[in-house]
Amino acid sequence: MSGFDRRSFLKASMVTAAATALAACASSERATGTTPKAAGKSVMGLVVPKMDEVRVGLIGVGERGIGFVHHFSRIEGARITAICDTDTLVLARAEKAINEYGRDKPAYFSKGDHAYRDLLNRDDVDIVVIATPWAWHHPMAKEAMLAGKHAFVEVPMAGTIEELWDLVDTAELTQRNCMMMENVCYGRDELMVLNMVRQGLFGELLHGEAAYIHELRWQMKEIDRKTGSWRTAYHAKYNGNLYPTHGLGPVAQYMNINRGDRLDYLTSVSSPSLGRAAYAKREFPADHQRNQLKYIGGDMNTSLIKTVKGRSIMVQHDTTTPRPYSRHNLIQGTNGVFGGFPNRIALENGGSGSYHEWDENMDSWYAKYDHPLWTRMGKEAEENGGHGGMDFLMCWRMIYCLRNGEALDQDVYDGAAWSAVFPLSVASVGDRGNSKDFPDFTRGVWQTAKPLGIVG
Protein backbone atom coordinates (compact mmCIF):
# COMPACT_ATOMS: atom_id res chain seq x y z
CA MET A 1 0.00 0.00 0.00
CA SER A 2 1.50 3.36 -1.02
CA GLY A 3 1.96 6.16 1.50
CA PHE A 4 -0.88 8.13 -0.02
CA ASP A 5 -3.23 5.15 -0.12
CA ARG A 6 -2.35 4.27 3.47
CA ARG A 7 -3.12 7.81 4.64
CA SER A 8 -6.41 7.75 2.76
CA PHE A 9 -7.28 4.37 4.27
CA LEU A 10 -6.49 5.49 7.82
CA LYS A 11 -8.44 8.71 7.37
CA ALA A 12 -11.45 6.85 5.97
CA SER A 13 -11.29 4.40 8.87
CA MET A 14 -11.28 7.25 11.38
CA VAL A 15 -14.27 8.89 9.72
CA THR A 16 -16.22 5.63 9.68
CA ALA A 17 -15.51 4.93 13.35
CA ALA A 18 -16.41 8.48 14.31
CA ALA A 19 -19.63 8.42 12.34
CA THR A 20 -20.64 5.19 14.08
CA ALA A 21 -19.95 6.67 17.51
CA LEU A 22 -21.79 9.88 16.72
CA ALA A 23 -24.79 7.95 15.47
CA ALA A 24 -25.03 6.44 18.94
CA CYS A 25 -25.73 9.93 20.28
CA ALA A 26 -29.46 9.87 19.63
CA SER A 27 -30.55 12.76 17.43
CA SER A 28 -33.89 12.81 19.22
CA GLU A 29 -32.07 13.59 22.46
CA ARG A 30 -30.04 16.35 20.83
CA ALA A 31 -33.15 18.02 19.46
CA THR A 32 -34.85 18.11 22.87
CA GLY A 33 -33.82 19.25 26.31
CA THR A 34 -32.33 15.85 27.14
CA THR A 35 -28.55 15.81 27.49
CA PRO A 36 -27.24 13.11 25.14
CA LYS A 37 -24.66 10.60 26.24
CA ALA A 38 -21.12 11.74 25.50
CA ALA A 39 -19.30 10.09 22.60
CA GLY A 40 -15.90 11.22 23.86
CA LYS A 41 -14.27 13.15 26.69
CA SER A 42 -14.62 16.84 27.44
CA VAL A 43 -12.55 19.34 25.46
CA MET A 44 -12.82 22.03 28.12
CA GLY A 45 -9.32 23.49 28.34
CA LEU A 46 -8.14 21.32 25.45
CA VAL A 47 -4.41 21.64 24.79
CA VAL A 48 -2.99 20.11 21.63
CA PRO A 49 0.70 19.46 20.82
CA LYS A 50 2.66 22.58 19.94
CA MET A 51 2.92 23.41 16.26
CA ASP A 52 6.12 25.03 14.99
CA GLU A 53 4.13 26.25 12.01
CA VAL A 54 0.35 26.37 11.73
CA ARG A 55 -0.77 25.38 8.24
CA VAL A 56 -4.04 27.10 7.43
CA GLY A 57 -6.79 26.03 5.04
CA LEU A 58 -9.38 28.68 4.20
CA ILE A 59 -12.91 27.82 3.08
CA GLY A 60 -14.67 30.93 1.85
CA VAL A 61 -12.69 34.04 0.91
CA GLY A 62 -15.50 36.39 -0.03
CA GLU A 63 -16.71 39.46 1.85
CA ARG A 64 -15.62 38.09 5.22
CA GLY A 65 -13.00 35.54 4.31
CA ILE A 66 -10.68 37.81 2.33
CA GLY A 67 -9.70 39.43 5.62
CA PHE A 68 -8.32 36.11 6.83
CA VAL A 69 -6.11 35.90 3.73
CA HIS A 70 -4.50 39.18 4.78
CA HIS A 71 -4.30 38.42 8.51
CA PHE A 72 -2.75 34.95 8.26
CA SER A 73 -0.32 36.17 5.60
CA ARG A 74 1.01 38.69 8.12
CA ILE A 75 1.22 36.50 11.22
CA GLU A 76 4.50 34.82 12.06
CA GLY A 77 4.21 31.06 12.27
CA ALA A 78 1.12 30.81 10.06
CA ARG A 79 1.13 29.64 6.45
CA ILE A 80 -1.89 29.41 4.16
CA THR A 81 -1.57 26.10 2.31
CA ALA A 82 -5.01 25.71 0.71
CA ILE A 83 -7.94 27.96 -0.23
CA CYS A 84 -11.41 26.96 -1.40
CA ASP A 85 -14.25 29.08 -2.77
CA THR A 86 -16.86 28.27 -5.39
CA ASP A 87 -16.68 31.86 -6.67
CA THR A 88 -13.69 32.07 -9.01
CA LEU A 89 -13.70 35.87 -8.86
CA VAL A 90 -13.03 36.01 -5.11
CA LEU A 91 -10.61 33.10 -5.42
CA ALA A 92 -8.61 35.11 -7.95
CA ARG A 93 -8.64 38.07 -5.57
CA ALA A 94 -7.25 35.87 -2.79
CA GLU A 95 -4.55 34.52 -5.11
CA LYS A 96 -3.55 38.08 -6.02
CA ALA A 97 -3.23 38.98 -2.33
CA ILE A 98 -1.11 35.90 -1.59
CA ASN A 99 1.21 36.79 -4.46
CA GLU A 100 1.57 40.38 -3.25
CA TYR A 101 2.68 39.12 0.17
CA GLY A 102 5.29 36.94 -1.51
CA ARG A 103 4.03 33.86 0.31
CA ASP A 104 4.23 30.29 -0.95
CA LYS A 105 1.49 29.43 -3.40
CA PRO A 106 -1.35 27.49 -1.75
CA ALA A 107 -3.53 24.91 -3.46
CA TYR A 108 -6.80 26.31 -4.82
CA PHE A 109 -10.15 24.55 -5.07
CA SER A 110 -13.35 25.82 -6.68
CA LYS A 111 -15.18 23.05 -8.52
CA GLY A 112 -18.59 22.57 -6.94
CA ASP A 113 -20.20 22.97 -3.54
CA HIS A 114 -18.16 20.11 -2.08
CA ALA A 115 -14.76 21.14 -3.40
CA TYR A 116 -13.86 21.92 0.21
CA ARG A 117 -13.53 18.18 0.80
CA ASP A 118 -10.44 18.18 -1.40
CA LEU A 119 -8.97 20.75 0.98
CA LEU A 120 -9.91 18.62 4.00
CA ASN A 121 -8.17 15.59 2.51
CA ARG A 122 -4.80 17.33 2.35
CA ASP A 123 -2.03 16.43 4.77
CA ASP A 124 -0.59 19.96 4.78
CA VAL A 125 -3.59 21.54 6.56
CA ASP A 126 -3.66 21.75 10.37
CA ILE A 127 -6.56 24.14 10.88
CA VAL A 128 -9.55 25.00 8.72
CA VAL A 129 -11.02 28.51 8.83
CA ILE A 130 -14.63 28.59 7.62
CA ALA A 131 -16.12 31.88 6.41
CA THR A 132 -19.08 30.76 4.32
CA PRO A 133 -22.86 31.37 4.38
CA TRP A 134 -24.31 30.23 7.70
CA ALA A 135 -25.92 27.02 6.44
CA TRP A 136 -22.49 25.57 5.65
CA HIS A 137 -20.92 26.24 9.05
CA HIS A 138 -22.08 23.04 10.74
CA PRO A 139 -21.31 20.48 8.01
CA MET A 140 -17.93 21.99 7.14
CA ALA A 141 -16.79 22.27 10.77
CA LYS A 142 -17.89 18.70 11.49
CA GLU A 143 -16.17 17.29 8.42
CA ALA A 144 -13.02 19.26 9.22
CA MET A 145 -12.77 17.67 12.66
CA LEU A 146 -13.50 14.20 11.29
CA ALA A 147 -10.65 14.78 8.84
CA GLY A 148 -8.32 15.42 11.78
CA LYS A 149 -8.24 19.21 11.47
CA HIS A 150 -9.02 21.89 14.03
CA ALA A 151 -12.10 23.87 12.98
CA PHE A 152 -12.39 27.64 13.27
CA VAL A 153 -15.81 28.76 12.12
CA GLU A 154 -17.43 32.14 11.62
CA VAL A 155 -20.48 33.17 13.64
CA PRO A 156 -22.96 31.65 14.30
CA MET A 157 -21.50 28.19 14.83
CA ALA A 158 -24.68 26.41 13.69
CA GLY A 159 -28.40 27.06 13.31
CA THR A 160 -30.18 24.36 15.33
CA ILE A 161 -29.79 22.78 18.75
CA GLU A 162 -29.22 19.40 17.12
CA GLU A 163 -26.42 20.79 14.94
CA LEU A 164 -24.79 22.45 17.95
CA TRP A 165 -24.83 19.19 19.89
CA ASP A 166 -23.38 17.46 16.84
CA LEU A 167 -20.39 19.81 16.82
CA VAL A 168 -19.88 19.38 20.57
CA ASP A 169 -20.00 15.60 20.22
CA THR A 170 -17.65 15.63 17.23
CA ALA A 171 -15.12 17.83 19.03
CA GLU A 172 -15.18 15.54 22.06
CA LEU A 173 -14.90 12.39 19.97
CA THR A 174 -12.04 13.63 17.79
CA GLN A 175 -10.35 15.75 20.49
CA ARG A 176 -10.13 18.61 18.03
CA ASN A 177 -10.75 22.28 18.62
CA CYS A 178 -13.95 23.76 17.25
CA MET A 179 -13.81 27.49 17.91
CA MET A 180 -16.49 29.90 16.79
CA MET A 181 -14.47 33.00 15.95
CA GLU A 182 -16.26 35.68 17.97
CA ASN A 183 -14.01 38.57 17.04
CA VAL A 184 -15.71 41.13 19.29
CA CYS A 185 -14.22 39.39 22.33
CA TYR A 186 -10.89 40.80 21.09
CA GLY A 187 -11.98 44.43 20.82
CA ARG A 188 -10.06 46.90 22.96
CA ASP A 189 -13.12 47.98 24.94
CA GLU A 190 -14.36 44.44 25.54
CA LEU A 191 -10.92 43.31 26.69
CA MET A 192 -10.64 46.30 29.01
CA VAL A 193 -14.03 45.57 30.58
CA LEU A 194 -13.04 41.92 31.03
CA ASN A 195 -9.95 43.10 32.89
CA MET A 196 -12.07 45.46 35.01
CA VAL A 197 -14.46 42.65 35.88
CA ARG A 198 -11.65 40.27 36.83
CA GLN A 199 -10.19 42.93 39.13
CA GLY A 200 -13.55 43.28 40.88
CA LEU A 201 -14.20 46.87 39.84
CA PHE A 202 -17.95 46.37 39.47
CA GLY A 203 -18.43 44.11 42.49
CA GLU A 204 -20.63 41.04 42.12
CA LEU A 205 -22.11 40.89 38.64
CA LEU A 206 -25.88 41.13 38.32
CA HIS A 207 -26.96 42.00 34.79
CA GLY A 208 -25.64 42.42 31.26
CA GLU A 209 -26.95 43.88 28.04
CA ALA A 210 -25.84 42.83 24.57
CA ALA A 211 -27.00 43.59 21.06
CA TYR A 212 -26.41 43.54 17.36
CA ILE A 213 -28.07 46.73 16.18
CA HIS A 214 -26.74 47.40 12.70
CA GLU A 215 -28.89 48.75 9.87
CA LEU A 216 -28.27 46.38 6.95
CA ARG A 217 -31.26 46.90 4.67
CA TRP A 218 -28.85 47.87 1.89
CA GLN A 219 -27.75 44.23 1.72
CA MET A 220 -31.12 43.48 0.14
CA LYS A 221 -29.68 45.00 -3.07
CA GLU A 222 -27.10 42.20 -3.21
CA ILE A 223 -29.07 39.78 -5.36
CA ASP A 224 -26.72 37.30 -7.00
CA ARG A 225 -23.52 37.68 -4.99
CA LYS A 226 -22.26 38.86 -1.60
CA THR A 227 -23.85 38.56 1.84
CA GLY A 228 -27.30 39.91 1.04
CA SER A 229 -27.84 37.31 -1.66
CA TRP A 230 -28.35 34.62 1.00
CA ARG A 231 -28.81 36.48 4.28
CA THR A 232 -31.98 38.35 3.25
CA ALA A 233 -33.97 35.11 3.07
CA TYR A 234 -33.50 34.51 6.80
CA HIS A 235 -35.79 37.47 7.52
CA ALA A 236 -38.54 35.71 5.57
CA LYS A 237 -38.02 32.38 7.31
CA TYR A 238 -37.35 33.11 10.99
CA ASN A 239 -38.72 35.41 13.67
CA GLY A 240 -36.17 35.72 16.45
CA ASN A 241 -32.61 36.81 17.12
CA LEU A 242 -30.78 35.79 13.95
CA TYR A 243 -27.32 36.96 15.02
CA PRO A 244 -26.77 37.04 18.79
CA THR A 245 -23.10 36.38 19.40
CA HIS A 246 -21.32 39.70 18.73
CA GLY A 247 -22.91 41.33 21.76
CA LEU A 248 -23.42 38.22 23.87
CA GLY A 249 -19.92 36.76 23.60
CA PRO A 250 -18.10 39.43 25.62
CA VAL A 251 -20.87 39.65 28.24
CA ALA A 252 -20.77 35.86 28.62
CA GLN A 253 -17.03 36.04 29.20
CA TYR A 254 -17.49 38.77 31.82
CA MET A 255 -19.94 36.46 33.63
CA ASN A 256 -17.78 33.32 33.32
CA ILE A 257 -20.49 31.52 31.37
CA ASN A 258 -19.52 27.83 31.02
CA ARG A 259 -16.80 28.46 33.61
CA GLY A 260 -18.66 28.88 36.88
CA ASP A 261 -22.09 29.87 35.58
CA ARG A 262 -24.30 28.74 32.72
CA LEU A 263 -27.08 30.09 30.51
CA ASP A 264 -30.25 28.53 31.92
CA TYR A 265 -33.28 29.71 29.93
CA LEU A 266 -34.53 32.58 27.80
CA THR A 267 -37.76 34.28 26.85
CA SER A 268 -38.05 36.23 23.63
CA VAL A 269 -40.43 38.63 21.88
CA SER A 270 -40.28 40.48 18.58
CA SER A 271 -41.69 43.75 17.34
CA PRO A 272 -43.79 43.89 14.17
CA SER A 273 -41.98 43.16 10.91
CA LEU A 274 -42.41 46.31 8.84
CA GLY A 275 -39.07 47.76 7.79
CA ARG A 276 -37.89 45.30 5.15
CA ALA A 277 -41.19 45.15 3.30
CA ALA A 278 -41.31 48.95 3.26
CA TYR A 279 -37.71 49.13 2.02
CA ALA A 280 -38.40 46.59 -0.72
CA LYS A 281 -41.48 48.50 -1.85
CA ARG A 282 -39.48 51.74 -1.99
CA GLU A 283 -36.31 50.42 -3.62
CA PHE A 284 -37.44 47.66 -6.02
CA PRO A 285 -40.05 47.22 -8.77
CA ALA A 286 -43.32 45.66 -7.68
CA ASP A 287 -42.53 42.39 -9.45
CA HIS A 288 -38.98 42.13 -8.04
CA GLN A 289 -38.10 39.05 -5.99
CA ARG A 290 -37.53 41.20 -2.90
CA ASN A 291 -41.20 42.21 -3.08
CA GLN A 292 -42.33 38.60 -3.39
CA LEU A 293 -40.96 37.64 0.03
CA LYS A 294 -43.08 37.80 3.15
CA TYR A 295 -40.77 39.17 5.84
CA ILE A 296 -41.74 37.66 9.19
CA GLY A 297 -38.72 38.51 11.36
CA GLY A 298 -39.56 41.32 13.76
CA ASP A 299 -37.57 44.47 13.13
CA MET A 300 -36.43 44.37 16.77
CA ASN A 301 -36.09 41.17 18.76
CA THR A 302 -35.50 41.27 22.52
CA SER A 303 -34.50 38.17 24.44
CA LEU A 304 -34.02 37.93 28.21
CA ILE A 305 -31.69 35.24 29.52
CA LYS A 306 -31.49 33.91 33.07
CA THR A 307 -28.31 32.19 34.21
CA VAL A 308 -28.10 29.34 36.69
CA LYS A 309 -26.66 31.77 39.26
CA GLY A 310 -29.63 34.08 38.75
CA ARG A 311 -28.03 36.81 36.66
CA SER A 312 -29.94 38.37 33.77
CA ILE A 313 -28.82 39.25 30.25
CA MET A 314 -30.79 41.22 27.67
CA VAL A 315 -29.87 40.44 24.05
CA GLN A 316 -31.31 42.47 21.17
CA HIS A 317 -31.20 42.10 17.39
CA ASP A 318 -32.14 44.76 14.85
CA THR A 319 -30.63 44.99 11.37
CA THR A 320 -33.60 46.81 9.86
CA THR A 321 -34.52 50.10 11.53
CA PRO A 322 -32.71 53.42 10.91
CA ARG A 323 -30.61 54.02 14.01
CA PRO A 324 -26.93 54.18 15.05
CA TYR A 325 -24.88 51.03 15.44
CA SER A 326 -24.72 49.45 18.91
CA ARG A 327 -23.75 46.26 20.70
CA HIS A 328 -24.73 47.75 24.10
CA ASN A 329 -21.85 46.03 25.93
CA LEU A 330 -23.30 46.84 29.34
CA ILE A 331 -22.35 45.09 32.55
CA GLN A 332 -23.90 45.95 35.93
CA GLY A 333 -22.53 44.90 39.29
CA THR A 334 -23.13 45.73 42.93
CA ASN A 335 -20.51 48.51 42.77
CA GLY A 336 -21.37 50.08 39.44
CA VAL A 337 -21.82 49.77 35.72
CA PHE A 338 -20.03 50.05 32.38
CA GLY A 339 -21.95 50.78 29.21
CA GLY A 340 -20.81 50.98 25.62
CA PHE A 341 -21.85 52.96 22.54
CA PRO A 342 -20.74 55.42 23.75
CA ASN A 343 -18.38 54.16 26.45
CA ARG A 344 -19.26 55.35 29.93
CA ILE A 345 -18.82 54.20 33.51
CA ALA A 346 -20.39 54.90 36.91
CA LEU A 347 -19.09 53.51 40.21
CA GLU A 348 -20.10 53.83 43.84
CA ASN A 349 -16.54 53.26 45.03
CA GLY A 350 -13.45 53.90 42.95
CA GLY A 351 -14.93 56.28 40.41
CA SER A 352 -13.98 59.86 39.65
CA GLY A 353 -17.35 61.29 40.58
CA SER A 354 -20.91 60.51 41.60
CA TYR A 355 -22.46 57.30 40.34
CA HIS A 356 -25.53 59.38 39.53
CA GLU A 357 -23.67 60.70 36.49
CA TRP A 358 -21.78 58.92 33.73
CA ASP A 359 -18.04 59.36 33.41
CA GLU A 360 -17.49 59.42 29.65
CA ASN A 361 -13.78 60.30 29.73
CA MET A 362 -12.17 56.95 29.04
CA ASP A 363 -8.51 58.00 28.85
CA SER A 364 -7.72 57.34 32.51
CA TRP A 365 -9.60 54.03 32.44
CA TYR A 366 -7.68 52.83 29.39
CA ALA A 367 -4.43 53.84 31.06
CA LYS A 368 -5.23 51.80 34.16
CA TYR A 369 -7.23 48.87 32.82
CA ASP A 370 -6.21 48.22 29.22
CA HIS A 371 -5.97 44.45 28.84
CA PRO A 372 -2.36 43.15 28.75
CA LEU A 373 -3.08 41.50 25.41
CA TRP A 374 -4.06 44.86 23.93
CA THR A 375 -1.10 46.59 25.58
CA ARG A 376 1.17 44.04 23.92
CA MET A 377 -0.47 43.75 20.50
CA GLY A 378 -2.89 46.66 20.16
CA LYS A 379 -0.70 48.87 17.98
CA GLU A 380 0.04 46.02 15.57
CA ALA A 381 -3.63 45.01 15.58
CA GLU A 382 -4.80 48.51 14.69
CA GLU A 383 -2.20 48.76 11.92
CA ASN A 384 -3.37 45.48 10.40
CA GLY A 385 -7.05 46.37 10.70
CA GLY A 386 -10.19 44.29 10.76
CA HIS A 387 -12.93 46.04 12.77
CA GLY A 388 -10.45 48.25 14.58
CA GLY A 389 -7.90 45.48 15.03
CA MET A 390 -10.07 42.88 16.76
CA ASP A 391 -9.99 40.55 13.75
CA PHE A 392 -6.21 40.56 13.47
CA LEU A 393 -5.79 40.13 17.23
CA MET A 394 -8.16 37.15 17.22
CA CYS A 395 -6.20 35.47 14.42
CA TRP A 396 -2.89 36.25 16.10
CA ARG A 397 -4.11 34.79 19.38
CA MET A 398 -5.38 31.62 17.68
CA ILE A 399 -1.97 31.01 16.11
CA TYR A 400 -0.14 31.91 19.33
CA CYS A 401 -2.12 29.36 21.37
CA LEU A 402 -1.57 26.59 18.83
CA ARG A 403 2.16 27.29 18.56
CA ASN A 404 2.67 27.50 22.32
CA GLY A 405 0.53 24.60 23.51
CA GLU A 406 -2.11 26.74 25.21
CA ALA A 407 -5.87 26.30 25.35
CA LEU A 408 -7.87 28.58 23.07
CA ASP A 409 -9.81 31.47 24.60
CA GLN A 410 -13.10 30.21 23.13
CA ASP A 411 -14.15 26.59 22.79
CA VAL A 412 -16.94 24.55 21.25
CA TYR A 413 -19.08 24.96 24.38
CA ASP A 414 -18.94 28.75 24.13
CA GLY A 415 -19.86 28.69 20.46
CA ALA A 416 -22.74 26.33 21.13
CA ALA A 417 -24.19 28.27 24.06
CA TRP A 418 -23.95 31.67 22.40
CA SER A 419 -25.30 30.41 19.06
CA ALA A 420 -28.22 28.63 20.77
CA VAL A 421 -29.93 32.00 21.29
CA PHE A 422 -30.97 31.92 17.62
CA PRO A 423 -33.05 28.72 17.62
CA LEU A 424 -34.26 29.18 21.19
CA SER A 425 -35.43 32.74 20.51
CA VAL A 426 -37.31 31.59 17.41
CA ALA A 427 -39.00 28.88 19.49
CA SER A 428 -39.89 31.33 22.26
CA VAL A 429 -41.29 33.98 19.91
CA GLY A 430 -43.42 31.30 18.28
CA ASP A 431 -44.69 30.23 21.71
CA ARG A 432 -45.92 33.63 22.96
CA GLY A 433 -42.63 34.36 24.69
CA ASN A 434 -42.66 31.29 26.91
CA SER A 435 -39.25 30.33 28.27
CA LYS A 436 -36.97 27.85 26.51
CA ASP A 437 -34.16 26.01 28.26
CA PHE A 438 -30.53 26.11 27.16
CA PRO A 439 -28.89 22.70 26.91
CA ASP A 440 -25.88 22.16 29.14
CA PHE A 441 -23.43 21.58 26.33
CA THR A 442 -20.63 21.09 28.88
CA ARG A 443 -22.47 18.18 30.53
CA GLY A 444 -21.80 19.62 33.99
CA VAL A 445 -18.15 20.56 33.47
CA TRP A 446 -19.03 24.27 33.77
CA GLN A 447 -19.21 23.78 37.54
CA THR A 448 -15.48 23.03 37.84
CA ALA A 449 -13.99 24.73 34.77
CA LYS A 450 -11.52 27.55 35.41
CA PRO A 451 -12.53 31.10 34.41
CA LEU A 452 -10.93 32.65 31.35
CA GLY A 453 -7.76 34.29 32.60
CA ILE A 454 -6.20 37.65 31.81
CA VAL A 455 -3.38 36.75 29.43
CA GLY A 456 -0.77 38.92 27.80
Curated annotation (Swiss-Prot):
The keyword Phosphoprotein does not apply. The keyword Signal applies. Binds 1 NAD(+) per subunit. The NAD(+) cannot dissociate. Keywords: Glycosidase, Hydrolase, NAD, Signal. Substrate binds at Y212, R231, Y243, P244, T245, H246, Y325. Residues 1-33 form the signal peptide. Predicted to be exported by the Tat system. The position of the signal peptide cleavage has not been experimentally proven. NAD(+) binds at E63, R64, D85, W134, A135, W136, H137, E154, V155, N183, Y243. Its EC number is 3.2.1.-. Glycosidase. Belongs to the Gfo/Idh/MocA family. Glycosyl hydrolase 109 subfamily. This is Glycosyl hydrolase family 109 protein 2.
